[in-house]
Amino acid sequence: MLLPVFTLKLRHKISPRMVAIGRYDGTHPCLAAATQTGKVFIHNPHTRNQHVSASRVFQSPLESDVSLLSINQAVSCLTAGVLNPELGYDALLVGTQTNLLAYDVYNNSDLFYREVADGANAIVLGTLGDISSPLAIIGGNCALQGFNHEGSDLFWTVTGDNVNSLALCDFDGDGKKELLVGSEDFDIRVFKEDEIVAEMTETEIVTSLCPMYGSRFGYALSNGTVGVYDKTSRYWRIKSKNHAMSIHAFDLNSDGVNELITGWSNGKVDARSDRTGEVIFKDNFSSAIAGVVEGDYRMDGHIQLICCSVDGEIRGYLPGTAEMRGNLMDTSAEQDLIRELSQKKQNLLLELRNYEENAKAELASPLNEADGHRGIIPANTRLHTTLSVSLGNETQTAHTELRISTSNDTIIRAVLIFAEGIFTGESHVVHPSIHNLSSSICIPIVPPKDVPVDLHLKAFVGYRSSTQFHVFESTRQLPRFSMYALTSLDPASEPISYVNFTIAERAQRVVVWLGQNFLLPEDTHIQNAPFQVCFTSLRNGGHLHIKIKLSGEITINTDDIDLAGDIIQSMASFFAIEDLQVEADFPVYFEELRKVLVKVDEYHSVHQKLSADMADHSNLIRSLLVGAEDARLMRDMKTMKSRYMELYDLNRDLLNGYKIRCNNHTELLGNLKAVNQAIQRAGRLRVGKPKNQVITACRDAIRSNNINTLFKIMRVGTASS
């Protein structure tokens, strides 16, 4: 049984996911955590009653070994580590929705303080790719930025949605770190510097990421799922009714391999095998876990796993010895395991009893009479599954239809479908009433996104009189673009927006790609190039035209820029295309973007004006306060009252101005997100180097406020003529 080697109770509440540990003087490890009052506390039990100079840091009135760092804003992310290798000690990085602070705790001074327009939702510190100096990488409003120790912006790119989690991991085994990004659009993206090298789609918002070892990493979702990936392959995952607040990799059983440590919202901490997800250790706190870190907190040469709760309770655990391996859990946990095994035993005994009763019934009854009740079906019974596109009717919207049928007169009593990202809870049960039983069932499926999905099916097959059923299991993949129906050619419906590119592939290979990614009717015959196919979206009725010429030139007509990007990325993956330059034009979308850019300029102007007004008000407040105090000292009560009335009015104006600034900032963030997403979409229309060039050139055009150049880059992929 593994017990904590130390326990602390700090009188400060800790914000979830905002705990870090660092050697801020180069020697002593100290905990840093954000509070809910716009402060960061630093717990240093090694040098008590240390003198603190007057700056951001002041001594906590509650505890002598806790110093408080005033941020005066809600802290949104926090980490610690070596930012400047020449200093020889760690820096503290604190992010808010408007700024990033790099703080030198030892000298009580700012390393840099940068305004970040896209906010900082997540932060990670380390080296990325071939960039030699350590970077503080922040993820915000669809954007990623990396700053060195001087505050210089050395890395910038965009991603598909608001960033929630970041981690650095050697994903491809080349000895250099790649950036893992988890975002609100359920995707985990892997950046090799500014190039996306892999994408994994999950079922919910990705809230946490952590490197395990090599190319293996852990992840957590907002629906209570935690798991482990090795590159793009998921090893395992489990789902809990509680939320995973923090995950961390730590070798708790001393077997040389890191386990996945998870802190939960109900106060539980558990350690799971990286290979199987089996729980090897767990403990409970009285409140939710805020963060999990590691460090030699006792300065005895041994690294401890340090778990912190939101109420300020801190426990440190030493890894188990070789003798304790496999016995890290307490007796209550072992009793839980015994109960679980007993339940499995009961289930097996019940199954055995069913077999025995079947055998007795077979001896006591004529064969045919007993068959139906026992669920015996013909040996040649087969389960058939087909996928097709249904345009819907008055009572049902358009959908993809899954038809499940048997090969004889047996009936399907129930169907269980397990699929990620389609059904609530990832499962769906179809259980027809006793009067509607038949040998086939049609199930409507409406995937919300264009991603391939594996449907895992379990069908209960028997006869109407059966009390026991045979279970058929099957797996069927839903194609990526299953929500698009093949339609007849209609030049009048051709969208004006298009992308155009050339690939060195035979037309027949493109036909194979179409067959794998769309649900084409069985009687569909596509002639050799040149040819054209037309589809209609089942979601919004939008049109999609794909034209292929003999030369390998492909034109895709659609008004949906996201769909065009998905098709290009799908083709690039199928045909193993490394670099692809594309010409694109989306007039309606570009006009909407132009309006957004005008709004961004307007909101920036309003922000500057409001800031100037606030500065003027601040100067006026000083003069009014001095005047009011002078009048009080001179016992001129009438003038004093007049000055304080003016102060009251000025204070009201300041509050109103603050509300306007908040609304203006919210609107500005929304429009900046739209701009960043537009750059990301323009990048997704290309592959490889052209993609990176478009993203970089778009950012340069926005920096120089050259809107016409921006749209030219989005259309042709370059600013040069």
Swiss-Prot record:
Keyword Nucleus: no
Coiled-coil intervals: 325-369
Keywords: Bardet-Biedl syndrome, Cell membrane, Cell projection, Ciliopathy, Cilium, Cilium biogenesis/degradation, Coiled coil, Cytoplasm, Cytoskeleton, Disease variant, Intellectual disability, Membrane, Obesity, Protein transport, Retinitis pigmentosa, Sensory transduction, Transport, Vision
Gene Ontology annotations of biological process type: adult behavior; artery smooth muscle contraction; brain morphogenesis; cartilage development; cerebral cortex development; cilium assembly; fat cell differentiation; gene expression
Consequence when changing R632P: In BBS2 and RP74
InterPro entries reported in the protein's UniProt record: Bardet-Biedl_syndrome_2_prot (IPR016616), BBS2_CtH_dom (IPR055381), BBS2_GAE_dom (IPR029333), BBS2_hp_dom (IPR055380), BBS2_Mid (IPR029429), BBS2_N (IPR029430), BBS2_pf_dom (IPR055379), WD40/YVTN_repeat-like_dom_sf (IPR015943)
Effect of L349W: In BBS2; has a modifier effect on BBS
Disulfide cross-links: none
Gene Ontology molecular-function annotations: RNA polymerase II-specific DNA-binding transcription factor binding
Name of this chain's protein: BBSome complex member BBS2
Organism whose genome encodes this protein: Homo sapiens
Gene behind the chain: BBS2
